[in-house]
Amino acid sequence: MSEDRQGRSGDSNKILYCSFCGKSQHEVRKLIAGPSVFICDECVELCNDIIREELEEKAQSARSSLPKPREILEVLDQYVIGQLRAKRTLAVAVYNHYKRIESRSKNDDVELAKSNILLVGPTGSGKTLLAETLARLLNVPFTIADATTLTEAGYVGEDVENIIQKLLQKCDYDVEKAQQGIVYIDEIDKISRKSENPSITRDVSGEGVQQALLKLIEGTVASVPPQGGRKHPQQEFLQVDTKNILFICGGAFAGLDKVIQQRSNDAGGIGFGAKVKSSERKQEVGKILAEVEPEDLIKFGLIPEFVGRLPVVATLEELDEPALIKILTEPKNAITKQFKKLFDMEGVELEFRPDALSAIAKKALKRKTGARGLRTIVESVLLDTMYELPSQENVSKVVVDESVIEHKSEPYLIYQAQPAPAKAASGD
């Protein structure tokens, strides 16, 4: 009976029925055949509706959980000191990016363009930390790529699709999650074109990498080998659409301030209308970088097409001594708080005197390492103490002052007061 009802694909006289709703081929417009199974067009439409409803529910829950720009800024303030303008720019750009993803799920007439971000600022000013904090807040996969290791496909080095493989690794090869992740490409200024004139020799780690990154950043379907695999012809690839991945590129762009100043001076003209150049009134690098225009980035060595793919530009200021002292003490994961917790696990209190914090900040400024160099300085002055402390008894407090930082003196150890020994009872 069931055989008569389903029909045989080889017998043209048998009436075929949908395996899901039971309607015959005469009651529906289309009947699609599978391996001994049939499905009608009405059931296909019903399945589409169910999937569409589920996707809409997911989009609505994501919409309600997406933090507003003000909320994003509040979280960034907990981890990153200063850089208010850059944080506001990022908060708005990230919010708009994920709103754009939501709008793509609807049948909207207006298609929103993708707004990738370029962070310009000195070493240790907080570019990577900003990107990491954003990804943690939004609970999306995040990976960091070093632009200096990238080369064009076919040359020794990493090709640009390795970036997507790293992102997949962060989310256990869940393609759907990876397609809404964040990629931070560091040292992007190091792949600038070596000169404004085209070279006869191929620039495989400069302009060539910029060309290779264009499609990836704009949005393409990247073929990535599965877990731990290498590319070879007989292999099945994972297809990852990058159109919803947010790319944040960062770099120090050393010398860009001079390019901007040159443009400003050229705009001033010559003669009576010219702007007066004064060496005494030297602007801070951060303020100069804030005036960056796309033409400055092109003159620096980024190709016009690449600059066009990074429409949101946020500039970060060089950190001064007060800002570095705040970084040492104020953020949720401040360096001094981390070391205090380590010492507390040994039952010892750790104290940094104000003059010590100032000395650490001055040392980092002298080394031109920004906030990145703070931890190195603190690690080096506390290394011997952290080595000896677990073997010592009765230490209650360790004090770090300016002499420990400047003259490499040993930190002060304060010991617990020992109870006086009980007197022996005298015999009568």
Swiss-Prot record:
SUPFAM superfamilies referenced in this protein's UniProt entry, alphabetically: Glucocorticoid receptor-like (DNA-binding domain), P-loop containing nucleoside triphosphate hydrolases
Q: Which GO terms describe its biological process?
A: cell division; proteolysis involved in protein catabolic process
* The keyword Isomerase belongs to this UniProt entry's keyword annotation: no
Q: What Gene Ontology terms describe what this protein does at the molecular function level?
A: ATP binding; ATP hydrolysis activity; ATP-dependent protein folding chaperone; protein dimerization activity; unfolded protein binding; zinc ion binding
Amino acids binding ATP: P122, T123, G124, S125, G126, K127, T128, L129
Q: Which InterPro entries match?
A: AAA+_ATPase, ATP-dep_Clp_protease_ClpX, ATPase_AAA_core, Clp_ATPase_C, Clp_protease_ATP-bd_su_ClpX, ClpX_bact, P-loop_NTPase, Znf_CppX_C4
Q: Which GO terms describe its cellular component?
A: HslUV protease complex
Taxonomy, superkingdom: Bacteria
Q: Where is the signal peptide?
A: none
Q: Which residues form the ClpX-type ZB domain?
A: 6-59
State the UniProt keywords alphabetically.
Answer: ATP-binding, Chaperone, Metal-binding, Nucleotide-binding, Zinc
Binding-site residues, Zn(2+): C18, C21, C40, C43
**Keyword Zinc on this protein?**
yes
**Subunit structure, per the record?**
Component of the ClpX-ClpP complex. Forms a hexameric ring that, in the presence of ATP, binds to fourteen ClpP subunits assembled into a disk-like structure with a central cavity, resembling the structure of eukaryotic proteasomes.
What HAMAP family has UniProt attached to this entry? Answer: ClpX
What protein family is recorded?
Answer: Belongs to the ClpX chaperone family.
The protein's job, in short, is: ATP-dependent specificity component of the Clp protease. It directs the protease to specific substrates. Can perform chaperone functions in the absence of ClpP.
Which protein, by its recorded name, is this? ATP-dependent Clp protease ATP-binding subunit ClpX
Source species of the chain:
Xanthomonas euvesicatoria pv. vesicatoria (strain 85-10) (Xanthomonas campestris pv. vesicatoria)
High-level lineage: Bacteria, Pseudomonadati, Pseudomonadota, Gammaproteobacteria, Lysobacterales
